[in-house]
Amino acid sequence: MSAAIVAPTPVSALVHSSTLVTAGVYLLVRFRVAFEGSDMQITLLLLFSLTIFMAGLGANFEYDLKKIIALSTLSQLGVIMRILSIGYANLGFFHLLSHALFKALLFICAGAVIHNIKDYQDIRVIGSLVSQIPLTTFCINLAKFGFMRESFLAGFYSKDLVLEIAFIRNIFLFFFILVCYRVNSVLYFLFSILYF
């Protein structure tokens, strides 16, 4: 993942929104029969839940614009894999599609912002973008609201279904708390992009 962060922003958009995430999800969808109903399913559930937690925590303390977006990709990958580990391949695919759409838009807009401010990626340096690039700022906000479960955007429906399935399936309280943390922690680091 660190090589994809250093790459030019269109390459990062391609790798993080489709290639990297889709390859892992596709492999688990194809091999999900191997771990359904076994002890390996609980191990994968724990592994993916810890991935969600650590990537979300790392993104909260980062100031590099592309690293924040990349760590949120890793966290979303954990959410998708967690959905697959409890047996909902169609929901995982739907969440993958909504994630890819908003993540690609966010990376392309981040590339436009970085280009506009002379290759600075530190969000503490970026400021008053609304007056400089209003259309790009609008697209960034649209992508952020898609990730933050704003009503009537695809992220709202996919993340709401994730929470509903986690609640209905009566999974362990620890895993349910981690899912709620992940779905709501995206608010913090996306608001940090908006704030700075």
Predicted regions and their residues:
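Hydrophobic transmembrane alpha-helices and their helix-loop junctions in integral membrane proteins
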Residues: S2-F196
